[in-house]
C-alpha cells in the first residue's frame, strides 16, 4: 500500500518521500527523552510507516542513548532488505 511519491534529494541519486519518520521519541525515557515509550508500539509504527510508503527514518545515537537506533533496527529486521527504508543517523556526543 505505497501511498507516497518520491523526490530527488538535491543532485544525488536518492529518491525520498516528502516526509519521513522521526524516531527521537522512540528513544524513550532518559534525562532528555520524551518519557516512556512502548517498544512494541514503536516497532508497529515503523512497520506501518514503511507499509504506507515512507522510505526514510531519522534517528541518532543520542535519542535514548542508542535505544532509538536499536528499536529501529529491530523493526527493520523483519522487512525484506529490498523494501527497507533509508536510515539517516548522526552522532556528536561521547558518553561512558
Protein language model annotation of sequence segments:
Residues 83-96:
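A short, structured active-site edge motif that brings together acidic residues
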Residues 1-86:
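N-terminal binding-site loop/beta-alpha segment at the start of enzyme catalytic domains
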